[in-house]
Protein backbone atom coordinates (compact mmCIF):
# COMPACT_ATOMS: atom_id res chain seq x y z
CA UNK A 1 0.00 0.00 0.00
CA UNK A 2 1.29 3.47 -0.91
CA UNK A 3 0.26 6.84 0.49
CA UNK A 4 0.49 10.10 -1.45
CA UNK A 5 -0.08 13.78 -0.69
CA UNK A 6 -2.46 15.14 -3.34
CA UNK A 7 -3.25 18.74 -4.31
CA UNK A 8 -6.88 18.88 -5.55
CA UNK A 9 -7.21 20.90 -8.77
CA UNK A 10 -9.61 23.86 -9.12
CA UNK A 11 -10.20 23.70 -5.39
CA UNK A 12 -8.63 25.71 -2.57
CA UNK A 13 -8.64 22.72 -0.22
CA UNK A 14 -5.11 22.17 1.16
CA UNK A 15 -3.25 18.99 0.07
CA UNK A 16 -4.79 15.74 1.34
CA UNK A 17 -3.47 12.19 1.82
CA UNK A 18 -4.86 9.27 -0.24
CA UNK A 19 -3.78 5.65 -0.63
CA UNK A 20 -3.09 3.59 -3.74
CA UNK A 21 -2.15 0.00 -4.48
CA UNK A 22 0.65 1.21 -6.71
CA UNK A 23 3.31 3.88 -6.48
CA UNK A 24 2.82 7.18 -8.35
CA UNK A 25 5.44 9.68 -9.43
CA UNK A 26 5.44 13.34 -8.40
CA UNK A 27 3.31 15.27 -10.91
CA UNK A 28 0.97 12.38 -11.79
CA UNK A 29 -2.68 13.36 -12.23
CA UNK A 30 -5.12 11.18 -10.30
CA UNK A 31 -8.84 11.05 -9.61
CA UNK A 32 -9.72 11.58 -5.94
CA UNK A 33 -13.01 11.44 -4.03
CA UNK A 34 -13.70 14.68 -2.14
CA UNK A 35 -17.00 15.73 -0.55
CA UNK A 36 -19.13 13.35 -2.62
CA UNK A 37 -17.41 14.44 -5.83
CA UNK A 38 -14.60 13.03 -7.94
CA UNK A 39 -11.90 15.61 -8.63
CA UNK A 40 -8.58 15.66 -10.42
CA UNK A 41 -5.54 16.03 -8.21
CA UNK A 42 -1.77 16.17 -8.59
CA UNK A 43 0.63 13.93 -6.67
CA UNK A 44 3.00 16.11 -4.65
CA UNK A 45 4.97 13.41 -2.85
CA UNK A 46 4.85 9.95 -1.30
CA UNK A 47 4.27 10.03 2.48
CA UNK A 48 4.27 7.63 5.41
CA UNK A 49 1.07 5.89 6.42
CA UNK A 50 -0.96 8.38 8.47
CA UNK A 51 -2.78 7.61 11.72
CA UNK A 52 -6.19 8.29 10.13
CA UNK A 53 -8.10 6.32 7.52
CA UNK A 54 -7.55 7.38 3.89
CA UNK A 55 -9.62 7.10 0.74
CA UNK A 56 -8.28 5.47 -2.42
CA UNK A 57 -7.15 7.42 -5.46
CA UNK A 58 -7.48 6.31 -9.07
CA UNK A 59 -4.73 6.77 -11.65
CA UNK A 60 -5.06 8.57 -15.01
CA UNK A 61 -2.71 8.56 -18.03
CA UNK A 62 -1.86 12.24 -17.50
CA UNK A 63 1.04 13.86 -15.65
CA UNK A 64 2.86 17.16 -15.31
CA UNK A 65 6.40 17.32 -16.64
CA UNK A 66 9.27 18.02 -14.19
CA UNK A 67 9.68 21.63 -15.33
CA UNK A 68 5.93 22.19 -14.85
CA UNK A 69 6.01 20.90 -11.27
CA UNK A 70 9.09 22.96 -10.44
CA UNK A 71 7.48 26.06 -11.92
CA UNK A 72 4.16 25.52 -10.11
CA UNK A 73 5.85 25.21 -6.72
CA UNK A 74 7.92 28.34 -7.40
CA UNK A 75 4.83 30.36 -8.41
CA UNK A 76 2.99 29.31 -5.25
CA UNK A 77 5.92 30.31 -3.06
CA UNK A 78 7.11 33.49 -4.79
CA UNK A 79 3.66 34.94 -5.51
CA UNK A 80 2.13 33.68 -2.23
CA UNK A 81 -0.56 31.78 -4.12
CA UNK A 82 -2.60 28.67 -3.36
CA UNK A 83 -0.73 25.66 -4.82
CA UNK A 84 -3.91 23.92 -6.01
CA UNK A 85 -4.97 27.07 -7.88
CA UNK A 86 -1.51 27.36 -9.44
CA UNK A 87 -1.44 23.72 -10.57
CA UNK A 88 -4.81 24.28 -12.25
CA UNK A 89 -3.08 26.64 -14.70
CA UNK A 90 -1.04 23.80 -16.22
CA UNK A 91 -2.05 21.47 -19.04
CA UNK A 92 -0.78 17.92 -18.33
CA UNK A 93 1.11 15.59 -20.67
CA UNK A 94 0.05 12.14 -21.87
CA UNK A 95 2.32 9.51 -23.41
CA UNK A 96 1.13 8.39 -26.83
CA UNK A 97 2.47 7.12 -30.13
CA UNK A 98 4.71 9.61 -31.88
CA UNK A 99 3.60 10.83 -35.28
CA UNK A 100 6.10 9.84 -37.97
CA UNK A 101 6.32 13.19 -39.71
CA UNK A 102 8.70 13.63 -42.57
CA UNK A 103 11.67 15.63 -41.32
CA UNK A 104 11.22 19.30 -42.14
CA UNK A 105 14.24 21.16 -43.47
CA UNK A 106 13.47 24.80 -42.65
CA UNK A 107 14.31 27.22 -45.45
CA UNK A 108 15.73 30.23 -43.66
CA UNK A 109 16.92 33.59 -44.88
CA UNK A 110 20.67 34.05 -44.65
CA UNK A 111 21.63 36.16 -41.67
CA UNK A 112 23.79 39.24 -42.07
CA UNK A 113 27.18 39.18 -40.37
CA UNK A 114 25.80 41.39 -37.59
CA UNK A 115 22.87 39.02 -37.03
CA UNK A 116 25.17 35.98 -37.10
CA UNK A 117 27.41 37.53 -34.46
CA UNK A 118 24.36 38.38 -32.34
CA UNK A 119 23.08 34.79 -32.52
CA UNK A 120 26.48 33.38 -31.54
CA UNK A 121 26.62 35.73 -28.56
CA UNK A 122 23.10 34.77 -27.44
CA UNK A 123 24.04 31.08 -27.53
CA UNK A 124 26.79 31.65 -24.97
CA UNK A 125 24.23 32.38 -22.24
CA UNK A 126 21.41 30.44 -20.62
CA UNK A 127 19.47 33.73 -20.42
CA UNK A 128 20.11 36.88 -22.42
CA UNK A 129 18.54 40.08 -23.73
CA UNK A 130 18.41 40.80 -27.47
CA UNK A 131 18.13 44.59 -27.58
CA UNK A 132 17.44 45.21 -31.26
CA UNK A 133 16.16 48.34 -32.94
CA UNK A 134 12.83 48.07 -34.77
CA UNK A 135 13.47 46.58 -38.21
CA UNK A 136 16.92 45.25 -37.24
CA UNK A 137 15.96 41.64 -37.95
CA UNK A 138 15.23 40.14 -34.51
CA UNK A 139 12.64 37.75 -35.95
CA UNK A 140 15.19 36.23 -38.34
CA UNK A 141 17.50 35.58 -35.39
CA UNK A 142 14.59 33.99 -33.51
CA UNK A 143 13.92 31.64 -36.43
CA UNK A 144 17.53 30.52 -36.68
CA UNK A 145 17.65 29.88 -32.92
CA UNK A 146 14.41 27.87 -33.15
CA UNK A 147 15.67 25.85 -36.13
CA UNK A 148 18.84 24.91 -34.25
CA UNK A 149 16.76 23.85 -31.22
CA UNK A 150 14.47 21.64 -33.33
CA UNK A 151 17.51 20.14 -35.04
CA UNK A 152 18.62 18.95 -31.57
CA UNK A 153 15.24 17.14 -31.27
CA UNK A 154 14.03 19.62 -28.65
CA UNK A 155 10.92 21.79 -28.63
CA UNK A 156 10.70 25.58 -28.58
CA UNK A 157 8.29 28.19 -27.26
CA UNK A 158 7.87 31.70 -28.63
CA UNK A 159 5.86 33.94 -26.30
CA UNK A 160 4.14 37.06 -27.63
CA UNK A 161 2.29 39.55 -25.43
CA UNK A 162 -1.06 39.70 -27.21
CA UNK A 163 -3.17 37.73 -29.66
CA UNK A 164 -2.91 40.63 -32.11
CA UNK A 165 0.74 39.69 -32.67
CA UNK A 166 0.22 36.00 -33.29
CA UNK A 167 -1.48 35.84 -36.75
CA UNK A 168 1.30 37.73 -38.53
CA UNK A 169 4.07 36.05 -36.57
CA UNK A 170 2.45 32.68 -37.26
CA UNK A 171 2.37 33.30 -41.02
CA UNK A 172 6.10 34.03 -41.09
CA UNK A 173 6.92 30.99 -38.97
CA UNK A 174 4.47 28.71 -40.81
CA UNK A 175 6.35 29.19 -44.06
CA UNK A 176 9.51 27.96 -42.36
CA UNK A 177 8.39 25.34 -39.81
CA UNK A 178 5.18 24.08 -41.47
CA UNK A 179 3.39 21.31 -39.48
CA UNK A 180 5.80 21.60 -36.55
CA UNK A 181 4.13 24.89 -35.58
CA UNK A 182 1.15 25.36 -33.25
CA UNK A 183 -0.65 28.51 -32.11
CA UNK A 184 -1.98 28.85 -28.54
CA UNK A 185 -4.06 31.62 -26.97
CA UNK A 186 -7.15 32.14 -24.81
CA UNK A 187 -9.59 32.57 -27.70
CA UNK A 188 -9.19 29.01 -28.99
CA UNK A 189 -12.35 26.94 -28.55
CA UNK A 190 -12.30 23.90 -26.26
CA UNK A 191 -12.27 21.62 -29.29
CA UNK A 192 -9.36 23.53 -30.84
CA UNK A 193 -7.43 23.28 -27.57
CA UNK A 194 -8.09 19.54 -27.41
CA UNK A 195 -6.80 19.03 -30.98
CA UNK A 196 -3.76 21.19 -30.21
CA UNK A 197 -2.87 19.13 -27.11
CA UNK A 198 -3.21 15.84 -29.01
CA UNK A 199 -0.63 17.12 -31.52
CA UNK A 200 1.57 18.21 -28.64
CA UNK A 201 1.39 14.74 -27.03
CA UNK A 202 2.38 13.06 -30.30
CA UNK A 203 5.11 15.69 -30.73
CA UNK A 204 3.72 16.66 -34.11
CA UNK A 205 3.90 20.21 -32.74
CA UNK A 206 7.47 21.10 -31.76
CA UNK A 207 7.20 24.89 -31.85
CA UNK A 208 4.47 26.78 -29.99
CA UNK A 209 3.70 30.45 -30.56
CA UNK A 210 1.46 31.78 -27.84
CA UNK A 211 0.50 34.31 -25.23
CA UNK A 212 1.58 34.02 -21.58
CA UNK A 213 -0.58 30.96 -20.77
CA UNK A 214 1.43 28.96 -23.35
CA UNK A 215 4.17 28.76 -20.73
CA UNK A 216 2.00 26.21 -18.88
CA UNK A 217 1.77 23.78 -21.80
CA UNK A 218 3.42 20.33 -21.57
CA UNK A 219 6.27 20.87 -24.04
CA UNK A 220 8.39 17.72 -23.98
CA UNK A 221 12.16 18.32 -24.14
CA UNK A 222 11.73 22.09 -23.99
CA UNK A 223 15.04 23.61 -25.06
CA UNK A 224 14.33 27.23 -25.96
CA UNK A 225 11.97 30.00 -24.84
CA UNK A 226 11.89 33.32 -26.66
CA UNK A 227 9.98 36.17 -25.01
CA UNK A 228 9.24 38.68 -27.77
CA UNK A 229 8.44 42.29 -26.76
CA UNK A 230 9.65 41.38 -23.27
CA UNK A 231 8.89 44.89 -21.97
CA UNK A 232 5.14 44.45 -22.47
CA UNK A 233 2.89 44.58 -19.39
CA UNK A 234 0.66 41.85 -20.88
CA UNK A 235 3.08 39.22 -19.54
CA UNK A 236 1.93 40.14 -16.03
CA UNK A 237 -1.27 38.48 -14.80
CA UNK A 238 -3.68 40.68 -12.87
CA UNK A 239 -5.60 37.77 -11.37
CA UNK A 240 -4.31 35.44 -8.69
CA UNK A 241 -1.72 34.06 -9.05
CA UNK A 242 -0.30 37.41 -10.23
CA UNK A 243 2.72 35.95 -12.03
CA UNK A 244 4.92 37.57 -14.66
CA UNK A 245 5.54 35.09 -17.49
CA UNK A 246 8.81 36.79 -18.49
CA UNK A 247 10.23 36.40 -15.00
CA UNK A 248 9.09 32.77 -14.83
CA UNK A 249 11.02 32.04 -18.03
CA UNK A 250 14.18 33.41 -16.42
CA UNK A 251 13.58 31.15 -13.42
CA UNK A 252 13.32 28.11 -15.73
CA UNK A 253 16.61 29.01 -17.41
CA UNK A 254 18.22 28.97 -13.97
CA UNK A 255 16.77 25.57 -12.99
CA UNK A 256 16.75 23.61 -16.26
CA UNK A 257 18.85 23.37 -19.46
CA UNK A 258 16.43 25.73 -21.20
CA UNK A 259 17.83 28.70 -23.08
CA UNK A 260 15.82 31.92 -22.69
CA UNK A 261 16.09 34.91 -25.03
CA UNK A 262 14.27 38.12 -24.13
CA UNK A 263 13.78 40.35 -27.16
CA UNK A 264 12.71 43.97 -27.53
CA UNK A 265 13.44 47.24 -29.30
CA UNK A 266 12.52 48.96 -26.03
CA UNK A 267 13.55 46.63 -23.20
CA UNK A 268 12.17 47.25 -19.74
CA UNK A 269 14.43 49.12 -17.33
CA UNK A 270 14.41 46.01 -15.11
CA UNK A 271 15.74 43.75 -17.88
CA UNK A 272 18.24 46.32 -19.12
CA UNK A 273 19.75 46.70 -15.64
CA UNK A 274 19.78 42.91 -15.14
CA UNK A 275 21.61 42.12 -18.40
CA UNK A 276 23.56 45.23 -19.40
CA UNK A 277 26.87 44.10 -17.93
CA UNK A 278 26.74 40.37 -18.73
CA UNK A 279 24.35 39.06 -21.40
CA UNK A 280 23.01 41.98 -23.42
CA UNK A 281 23.27 41.66 -27.19
CA UNK A 282 22.77 44.98 -28.98
CA UNK A 283 21.48 44.98 -32.56
CA UNK A 284 21.53 48.47 -34.05
CA UNK A 285 20.20 49.81 -37.32
CA UNK A 286 17.66 48.44 -39.78
CA UNK A 287 17.90 45.24 -41.79
CA UNK A 288 16.23 47.15 -44.66
CA UNK A 289 17.81 50.62 -44.95
CA UNK A 290 15.06 53.27 -45.15
CA UNK A 291 14.80 56.93 -44.21
CA UNK A 292 12.54 58.11 -41.39
CA UNK A 293 11.66 61.72 -40.64
CA UNK A 294 10.29 62.62 -37.19
CA UNK A 295 7.86 65.56 -37.02
CA UNK A 296 6.79 67.11 -33.70
CA UNK A 297 3.68 69.25 -33.36
CA UNK A 298 3.37 71.07 -30.04
CA UNK A 299 -0.38 71.14 -29.55
CA UNK A 300 -3.19 69.90 -27.33
CA UNK A 301 -5.53 69.58 -30.33
CA UNK A 302 -5.87 66.27 -32.12
CA UNK A 303 -6.97 66.63 -35.73
CA UNK A 304 -4.91 69.59 -36.94
CA UNK A 305 -4.38 70.97 -40.49
CA UNK A 306 -0.75 69.80 -40.36
CA UNK A 307 -1.83 66.24 -39.54
CA UNK A 308 -4.52 66.23 -42.22
CA UNK A 309 -1.97 67.35 -44.79
CA UNK A 310 0.39 64.50 -43.83
CA UNK A 311 -2.43 61.94 -44.07
CA UNK A 312 -3.61 63.28 -47.44
CA UNK A 313 -0.08 62.93 -48.84
CA UNK A 314 -0.09 59.27 -47.79
CA UNK A 315 -3.41 58.69 -49.55
CA UNK A 316 -2.22 60.49 -52.69
CA UNK A 317 0.82 58.17 -52.90
CA UNK A 318 -1.35 55.06 -52.33
CA UNK A 319 0.53 54.31 -49.11
CA UNK A 320 -0.75 53.59 -45.61
CA UNK A 321 -0.78 55.20 -42.17
CA UNK A 322 -1.29 54.02 -38.61
CA UNK A 323 -2.63 56.31 -35.88
CA UNK A 324 -2.12 55.63 -32.19
CA UNK A 325 -4.77 56.86 -29.75
CA UNK A 326 -4.31 56.07 -26.03
CA UNK A 327 -8.00 55.45 -25.35
CA UNK A 328 -10.45 53.09 -27.00
CA UNK A 329 -14.10 54.18 -27.35
CA UNK A 330 -14.76 57.90 -27.81
CA UNK A 331 -13.79 59.78 -24.71
CA UNK A 332 -12.08 58.86 -21.50
CA UNK A 333 -14.52 61.13 -19.65
CA UNK A 334 -17.78 62.90 -20.39
CA UNK A 335 -17.35 66.33 -18.82
CA UNK A 336 -19.98 68.93 -17.90
CA UNK A 337 -18.95 72.35 -19.22
CA UNK A 338 -20.91 74.14 -16.48
CA UNK A 339 -19.79 72.47 -13.24
CA UNK A 340 -16.82 70.52 -14.71
CA UNK A 341 -17.94 67.25 -13.13
CA UNK A 342 -17.51 64.02 -15.08
CA UNK A 343 -19.78 61.00 -15.20
CA UNK A 344 -18.45 58.44 -12.74
CA UNK A 345 -19.24 54.76 -12.43
CA UNK A 346 -21.63 54.26 -9.48
CA UNK A 347 -19.68 51.17 -8.42
CA UNK A 348 -16.08 52.34 -8.99
CA UNK A 349 -14.29 55.62 -8.29
CA UNK A 350 -13.37 56.08 -11.95
CA UNK A 351 -14.83 58.01 -14.86
CA UNK A 352 -16.90 56.14 -17.42
CA UNK A 353 -15.95 55.99 -21.11
CA UNK A 354 -18.22 56.91 -23.98
CA UNK A 355 -18.90 54.16 -26.56
CA UNK A 356 -20.80 55.59 -29.54
CA UNK A 357 -20.95 52.21 -31.25
CA UNK A 358 -23.32 50.93 -28.54
CA UNK A 359 -24.60 54.38 -27.49
CA UNK A 360 -23.51 53.77 -23.91
CA UNK A 361 -21.16 54.86 -21.18
CA UNK A 362 -19.04 51.98 -19.90
CA UNK A 363 -16.77 51.41 -16.92
CA UNK A 364 -13.58 49.64 -18.03
CA UNK A 365 -13.06 48.21 -14.52
CA UNK A 366 -16.35 46.53 -13.55
CA UNK A 367 -17.98 46.66 -17.05
CA UNK A 368 -21.09 48.47 -15.79
CA UNK A 369 -22.81 50.34 -18.64
CA UNK A 370 -25.58 52.93 -18.86
CA UNK A 371 -27.26 55.09 -21.53
CA UNK A 372 -25.49 58.33 -22.43
CA UNK A 373 -27.04 61.08 -20.26
CA UNK A 374 -28.51 64.17 -21.91
CA UNK A 375 -28.03 66.36 -18.81
CA UNK A 376 -25.47 66.59 -16.01
CA UNK A 377 -26.72 64.78 -12.89
CA UNK A 378 -24.96 67.32 -10.66
CA UNK A 379 -26.12 70.68 -12.10
CA UNK A 380 -28.69 69.69 -14.76
CA UNK A 381 -26.70 71.41 -17.53
CA UNK A 382 -27.17 70.07 -21.06
CA UNK A 383 -23.60 70.86 -22.17
CA UNK A 384 -21.67 67.58 -21.85
CA UNK A 385 -18.47 67.17 -23.87
CA UNK A 386 -15.64 64.68 -24.11
CA UNK A 387 -12.40 65.45 -22.30
CA UNK A 388 -10.10 63.06 -24.19
CA UNK A 389 -10.41 61.73 -27.68
CA UNK A 390 -10.63 58.03 -28.56
CA UNK A 391 -10.52 55.70 -31.56
CA UNK A 392 -14.15 56.14 -32.67
CA UNK A 393 -14.01 59.94 -32.57
CA UNK A 394 -10.79 59.99 -34.64
CA UNK A 395 -12.46 57.65 -37.14
CA UNK A 396 -15.56 59.83 -37.47
CA UNK A 397 -13.58 63.06 -37.86
CA UNK A 398 -11.18 61.60 -40.44
CA UNK A 399 -14.00 60.05 -42.47
CA UNK A 400 -15.61 63.48 -42.74
CA UNK A 401 -12.33 65.24 -43.59
CA UNK A 402 -10.52 62.74 -45.84
CA UNK A 403 -12.71 61.93 -48.81
CA UNK A 404 -12.42 58.35 -50.02
CA UNK A 405 -10.18 57.20 -47.17
CA UNK A 406 -10.75 53.62 -46.06
CA UNK A 407 -10.25 53.59 -42.29
CA UNK A 408 -10.39 50.78 -39.73
CA UNK A 409 -9.97 50.49 -35.95
CA UNK A 410 -7.78 48.03 -34.05
CA UNK A 411 -8.74 47.96 -30.37
CA UNK A 412 -10.32 45.52 -27.92
CA UNK A 413 -13.86 46.63 -28.77
CA UNK A 414 -13.33 45.72 -32.44
CA UNK A 415 -11.36 42.48 -31.91
CA UNK A 416 -13.66 40.56 -29.58
CA UNK A 417 -13.12 37.40 -31.66
CA UNK A 418 -10.11 35.96 -33.45
CA UNK A 419 -12.00 36.17 -36.76
CA UNK A 420 -12.58 39.93 -36.36
CA UNK A 421 -8.92 40.45 -35.52
CA UNK A 422 -7.78 38.47 -38.57
CA UNK A 423 -10.15 40.37 -40.85
CA UNK A 424 -8.88 43.78 -39.69
CA UNK A 425 -5.21 42.83 -40.03
CA UNK A 426 -5.67 40.94 -43.32
CA UNK A 427 -7.57 43.86 -44.88
CA UNK A 428 -4.81 46.26 -43.86
CA UNK A 429 -2.13 43.91 -45.15
CA UNK A 430 -4.00 43.61 -48.47
CA UNK A 431 -4.32 47.44 -48.59
CA UNK A 432 -8.11 47.29 -48.50
CA UNK A 433 -7.81 49.96 -45.80
CA UNK A 434 -5.52 53.00 -45.97
CA UNK A 435 -5.50 54.11 -42.34
CA UNK A 436 -5.51 51.95 -39.22
CA UNK A 437 -6.43 53.64 -35.92
CA UNK A 438 -5.59 51.77 -32.75
CA UNK A 439 -4.77 51.72 -29.08
CA UNK A 440 -1.61 50.10 -27.71
CA UNK A 441 -2.41 46.96 -29.73
CA UNK A 442 -1.24 48.86 -32.81
CA UNK A 443 2.30 49.27 -31.46
CA UNK A 444 3.00 45.57 -31.08
CA UNK A 445 5.08 43.91 -33.75
CA UNK A 446 3.03 44.58 -36.87
CA UNK A 447 5.08 44.72 -40.06
CA UNK A 448 3.40 46.25 -43.12
CA UNK A 449 5.42 47.23 -46.17
CA UNK A 450 3.32 50.19 -47.32
CA UNK A 451 3.08 52.05 -43.99
CA UNK A 452 4.89 55.34 -44.53
CA UNK A 453 3.33 57.38 -41.72
CA UNK A 454 2.97 56.60 -38.01
CA UNK A 455 0.95 59.13 -36.01
CA UNK A 456 1.07 59.40 -32.21
CA UNK A 457 -1.82 61.26 -30.57
CA UNK A 458 -2.34 61.89 -26.86
CA UNK A 459 1.04 60.60 -25.65
CA UNK A 460 0.94 63.30 -22.95
CA UNK A 461 -1.87 61.40 -21.23
CA UNK A 462 0.61 58.57 -20.63
CA UNK A 463 3.80 60.44 -19.72
CA UNK A 464 1.90 62.74 -17.33
CA UNK A 465 0.15 59.93 -15.46
CA UNK A 466 0.88 59.22 -11.79
CA UNK A 467 2.74 55.96 -12.41
CA UNK A 468 6.43 55.75 -11.50
CA UNK A 469 6.82 54.06 -14.92
CA UNK A 470 4.99 56.86 -16.78
CA UNK A 471 7.96 58.22 -18.73
CA UNK A 472 9.31 54.73 -19.46
CA UNK A 473 5.93 53.58 -20.76
CA UNK A 474 5.45 56.71 -22.88
CA UNK A 475 8.90 56.77 -24.49
CA UNK A 476 8.79 53.00 -25.10
CA UNK A 477 5.43 53.39 -26.80
CA UNK A 478 6.76 56.20 -29.00
CA UNK A 479 9.60 53.96 -30.20
CA UNK A 480 7.32 51.01 -30.81
CA UNK A 481 4.80 53.03 -32.84
CA UNK A 482 7.56 54.82 -34.74
CA UNK A 483 8.89 51.36 -35.61
CA UNK A 484 5.73 50.53 -37.57
CA UNK A 485 6.61 53.20 -40.16
CA UNK A 486 9.25 53.07 -42.91
CA UNK A 487 10.01 49.38 -42.54
CA UNK A 488 10.41 48.84 -46.29
CA UNK A 489 9.82 52.34 -47.69
CA UNK A 490 10.88 55.73 -46.38
CA UNK A 491 8.41 57.46 -44.13
CA UNK A 492 7.52 59.81 -41.31
CA UNK A 493 6.60 59.74 -37.64
CA UNK A 494 4.16 62.47 -36.60
CA UNK A 495 4.06 63.12 -32.83
CA UNK A 496 1.65 65.49 -31.12
CA UNK A 497 2.82 66.51 -27.65
CA UNK A 498 3.29 69.53 -25.42
CA UNK A 499 6.47 67.84 -24.08
CA UNK A 500 8.50 67.97 -27.29
CA UNK A 501 11.59 69.43 -25.58
CA UNK A 502 11.78 66.37 -23.31
CA UNK A 503 10.92 63.71 -25.89
CA UNK A 504 13.30 65.01 -28.58
CA UNK A 505 16.23 63.99 -26.36
CA UNK A 506 15.32 60.31 -26.53
CA UNK A 507 14.29 59.50 -30.10
CA UNK A 508 17.73 58.79 -31.56
CA UNK A 509 18.69 55.82 -29.40
CA UNK A 510 16.46 54.15 -26.81
CA UNK A 511 19.54 53.18 -24.82
CA UNK A 512 20.12 56.89 -24.15
CA UNK A 513 16.72 56.99 -22.47
CA UNK A 514 17.41 53.84 -20.42
CA UNK A 515 20.66 55.29 -19.11
CA UNK A 516 18.89 58.57 -18.29
CA UNK A 517 16.06 56.76 -16.50
CA UNK A 518 18.48 54.63 -14.47
CA UNK A 519 19.91 57.85 -13.07
CA UNK A 520 16.54 59.54 -12.53
CA UNK A 521 14.43 56.65 -11.20
CA UNK A 522 13.90 56.90 -7.47
CA UNK A 523 15.68 54.15 -5.51
CA UNK A 524 12.38 53.36 -3.78
CA UNK A 525 11.14 51.79 -7.03
CA UNK A 526 12.22 48.99 -9.38
CA UNK A 527 14.76 48.11 -10.62
CA UNK A 528 16.49 49.34 -7.44
CA UNK A 529 13.87 48.08 -4.97
CA UNK A 530 11.37 45.24 -5.09
CA UNK A 531 7.70 45.88 -4.34
CA UNK A 532 4.81 43.82 -3.04
CA UNK A 533 1.28 45.21 -2.99
CA UNK A 534 -1.38 43.88 -0.60
CA UNK A 535 -5.00 44.81 -1.37
CA UNK A 536 -7.84 44.88 1.17
CA UNK A 537 -11.39 45.51 0.02
CA UNK A 538 -14.90 45.59 1.43
CA UNK A 539 -18.32 46.93 0.44
CA UNK A 540 -18.12 49.12 3.56
CA UNK A 541 -15.31 51.68 3.35
CA UNK A 542 -14.70 51.78 7.10
CA UNK A 543 -14.34 47.99 7.24
CA UNK A 544 -11.92 48.03 4.30
CA UNK A 545 -9.79 50.57 6.16
CA UNK A 546 -9.98 48.54 9.37
CA UNK A 547 -8.78 45.44 7.51
CA UNK A 548 -5.72 47.29 6.23
CA UNK A 549 -4.96 48.84 9.65
CA UNK A 550 -5.26 45.46 11.36
CA UNK A 551 -3.01 43.96 8.69
CA UNK A 552 -0.46 46.76 9.20
CA UNK A 553 -0.29 46.00 12.91
CA UNK A 554 0.23 42.29 12.27
CA UNK A 555 2.76 42.95 9.52
CA UNK A 556 4.83 45.24 11.73
CA UNK A 557 5.80 42.24 13.84
CA UNK A 558 6.44 40.05 10.75
CA UNK A 559 8.70 42.31 8.70
CA UNK A 560 12.16 41.09 7.87
CA UNK A 561 15.10 43.47 8.17
CA UNK A 562 15.16 46.06 5.38
CA UNK A 563 11.44 45.80 4.53
CA UNK A 564 9.42 49.02 4.80
CA UNK A 565 5.65 49.38 4.93
CA UNK A 566 3.23 52.09 3.81
CA UNK A 567 -0.56 51.98 4.18
CA UNK A 568 -2.88 54.13 2.04
CA UNK A 569 -6.21 54.40 0.27
CA UNK A 570 -6.00 53.04 -3.29
CA UNK A 571 -5.71 55.68 -6.05
CA UNK A 572 -8.82 54.07 -7.54
CA UNK A 573 -10.78 53.98 -4.30
CA UNK A 574 -13.61 51.73 -5.41
CA UNK A 575 -13.97 48.95 -7.98
CA UNK A 576 -17.15 46.88 -8.43
CA UNK A 577 -18.74 48.45 -5.32
CA UNK A 578 -15.80 47.48 -3.09
CA UNK A 579 -13.65 50.08 -1.36
CA UNK A 580 -9.92 49.43 -1.58
CA UNK A 581 -6.98 50.02 0.74
CA UNK A 582 -3.40 49.08 -0.07
CA UNK A 583 -0.25 48.18 1.83
CA UNK A 584 2.97 48.61 -0.13
CA UNK A 585 6.01 46.66 1.02
CA UNK A 586 9.48 47.62 -0.23
CA UNK A 587 12.85 45.95 0.04
CA UNK A 588 16.07 45.60 -1.92
CA UNK A 589 15.97 41.89 -1.06
CA UNK A 590 13.11 39.91 -2.67
CA UNK A 591 13.58 37.01 -0.24
CA UNK A 592 12.94 39.36 2.68
CA UNK A 593 9.71 40.49 1.02
CA UNK A 594 8.52 36.92 0.46
CA UNK A 595 9.33 35.86 4.03
CA UNK A 596 7.48 38.90 5.40
CA UNK A 597 4.36 38.17 3.34
CA UNK A 598 4.39 34.46 4.20
CA UNK A 599 4.72 35.26 7.91
CA UNK A 600 1.81 37.70 7.69
CA UNK A 601 -0.46 35.25 5.85
CA UNK A 602 0.33 32.58 8.42
CA UNK A 603 -0.25 34.96 11.36
CA UNK A 604 -3.49 36.46 10.04
CA UNK A 605 -5.35 33.85 7.96
CA UNK A 606 -8.68 35.54 8.79
CA UNK A 607 -7.72 38.83 7.08
CA UNK A 608 -8.70 38.53 3.40
CA UNK A 609 -6.23 40.14 1.02
CA UNK A 610 -4.75 39.72 -2.44
CA UNK A 611 -0.98 39.60 -2.91
CA UNK A 612 0.67 41.23 -5.93
CA UNK A 613 4.41 40.57 -6.01
CA UNK A 614 6.32 42.85 -8.40
CA UNK A 615 3.30 44.97 -9.43
CA UNK A 616 3.75 46.82 -12.71
CA UNK A 617 1.71 49.72 -11.36
CA UNK A 618 -0.01 50.95 -8.21
CA UNK A 619 -3.68 51.81 -8.79
Swiss-Prot record:
It comes from the Bacteria. Keywords: ATP-binding, DNA replication, DNA-binding, Helicase, Hydrolase, Isomerase, Metal-binding, Nucleotide-binding, Primosome, Virulence, Zinc. Residues 119-285 form the Helicase ATP-binding domain. Residues 371-532 form the Helicase C-terminal domain. SMART domains: DEXDc, HELICc. A motif (DEAH box) lies at residues 228-231. Binds 2 zinc ions per subunit. It is an enzyme of class 5 (isomerase). Its cofactor is Zn(2+). InterPro entries: DEAD/DEAH_box_helicase_dom, Helicase_ATP-bd, Helicase_C-like, P-loop_NTPase, PriA, PriA_3primeBD, PriA_3primeBD_sf, PriA_C. One of its GO terms (biological process) is DNA replication. Its EC number is 5.6.2.4. GO terms for molecular function: 3'-5' DNA helicase activity; ATP binding; ATP hydrolysis activity; DNA binding; zinc ion binding. Disruption phenotype: No visible phenotype during growth in the lab. Unable to colonize the stomach of C57BL/6 mice after 4 and 8 weeks of infection. Bacteria are able to invade gastric epithelial or macrophage cells but do not survive as well as wild-type cells after 24 hours. Cells are more sensitive to DNA-damaging UV light and DNA gyrase inhibitor ciprofloxacin. Cells are very sensitive to H(2)O(2) and slightly more sensitive to growth at pH 4.0. One of its GO terms (cellular component) is primosome complex. PANTHER family: PRIMOSOMAL PROTEIN N (PTHR30580:SF0). Initiates the restart of stalled replication forks, which reloads the replicative helicase on sites other than the origin of replication. Recognizes and binds to abandoned replication forks and remodels them to uncover a helicase loading site. Promotes assembly of the primosome at these replication forks. Belongs to the helicase family. PriA subfamily. Component of the replication restart primosome. This is Replication restart protein PriA.
Amino acid sequence: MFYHLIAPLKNKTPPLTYFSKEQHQKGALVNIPLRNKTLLGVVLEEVSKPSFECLELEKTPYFLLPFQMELAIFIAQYYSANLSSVLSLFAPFKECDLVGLEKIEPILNILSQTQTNALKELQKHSASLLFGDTGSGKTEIYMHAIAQTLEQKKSALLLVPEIALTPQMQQRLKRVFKENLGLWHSKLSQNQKKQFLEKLYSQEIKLVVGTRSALFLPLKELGLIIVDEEHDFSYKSHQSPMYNARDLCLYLSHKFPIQVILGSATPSLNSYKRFKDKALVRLKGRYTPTQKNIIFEKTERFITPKLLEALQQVLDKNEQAIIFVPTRANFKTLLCQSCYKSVQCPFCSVNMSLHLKTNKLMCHYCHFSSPIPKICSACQSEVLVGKRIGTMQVLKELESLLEGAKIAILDKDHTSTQKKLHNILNDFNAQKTNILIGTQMISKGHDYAKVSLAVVLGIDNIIKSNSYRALEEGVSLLYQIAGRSARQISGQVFIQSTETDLLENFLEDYEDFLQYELQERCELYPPFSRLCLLEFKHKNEEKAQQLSLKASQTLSSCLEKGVTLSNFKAPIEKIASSYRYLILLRSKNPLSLIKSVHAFLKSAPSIPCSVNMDPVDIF
